[in-house]
Amino acid sequence: PLRPGPATLGVLLGSDCPHPAVCEGCQRPISDRFLMRVNESSWHEECLQCAACQQALTTSCYFRDRKLYCKQDYQQLFAAKCSGCMEKIAPTEFVMRALECVYHLGCFCCCVCERQLRKGDEFVLKEGQLLCKGDYEKEKDLLSSVSPDESDSVKSEDEDGDMKPAKGQGSQSKGGGDDGKDPRRPKRPRTILTTQQRRAFKASFEVSSKPCRKVRETLAAETGLSVRVVQVWFQNQRAKMKKLARRHQQQQEQQNSQRLGQEVLSSRMEGMMASYTPLAPPQQQIVAMEQSPCGSSDPFQQGLTPPQMPGDHMNPYGNDSIFHDIDSDTSLTSLSDCFLGSSDVGSLQARVGNPIDRLYSMQSSYFAS
């Protein structure tokens, strides 16, 4: 930190230190008989010198950013400068302050009328320049009169009657006041810039967007305009460039956000398509009971219900039924014993035949006997 006064120097004997001290400058232990003390830090005698002129510091020094300076170099490097003339301010001079800016008494004046501002005067600090109250009010009028557009076509105050009429008024007379403006204010013509004036302003703006007073006076003399008009044009041009830069930045951010959203959406869709695997259609499987192992070809063992025969009502299917082994101790060993393929189903239907035809054949054989 910046210290207002010189730091104190002290000389100690090396034998007085219980532990060998470390030099703040070279970061090496001090084994000399004498050492220097600056703000509770130890230095070699040869390391205690000005960081700018390399001169040895014997009586006093200035400390900033862990570096030591002599008085002359410190004032030359870090002394406060006037915001008006950019010259150094001596410690013995009186100054005027406006926010963070410091001025000489003679430099604390309006940049337009060059009237010195005293204590109690009203002023405005705009872009590092001081404006008295009167010139600031004039500037507000000129800000709307000079346009930095490419055409620079400026209409007179009489042509402002094209604006929409206020509520409750059918039309606006030419002699009436402007919308919301003071009717007592005198009308002023707007400044019209020629092609040569516009080129001169833009060429100077490309060199420096904030020219100094001498450049503004030179432009005013070359273009035949007042210094105030030149200054207002540069202010409007700077505001226009900031607005364009801000708009371009917003468009870039919007495009980047849209592109990022599309990339995220496409990546999500690709992930969903990659993770989707269609399920295979289930195979149609038919469950049937196990056939009887006996070699009987009796068609009534296939689950058909024949007509009741005399004396056969107790066991119409005979001794060997298709369900003969259901109540036995044996059981199916796996699920594969209960499933038949599609080819087995066709052969099963061929063997069974049509139940109606078999019923008619049984009836014919019954009555024939």
Curated annotation (Swiss-Prot):
LIM zinc-binding domain segment(s): 23-73, 82-135
GO cellular component: nucleus
PROSITE patterns: HOMEOBOX_1 (PS00027), HOMEOBOX_2 (PS50071), LIM_DOMAIN_1 (PS00478), LIM_DOMAIN_2 (PS50023)
Gene Ontology molecular function terms on file: DNA-binding transcription factor activity, RNA polymerase II-specific; metal ion binding; RNA polymerase II transcription regulatory region sequence-specific DNA binding
InterPro entries named in the record: HD, Homeobox_CS, Homeodomain-like_sf, LIM_Homeobox_TF, Znf_LIM
GO BP term (any one): neuron differentiation
Keywords, alphabetical: Activator, Developmental protein, DNA-binding, Homeobox, LIM domain, Metal-binding, Nucleus, Repeat, Transcription, Transcription regulation, Zinc
Localization per record: Nucleus
Region (Disordered) residue spans: 143-196
Protein purpose: Transcription factor involved in the regulation of podocyte-expressed genes. Essential for the specification of dorsal limb fate at both the zeugopodal and autopodal levels.
Protein name stated in the entry: LIM homeobox transcription factor 1-beta
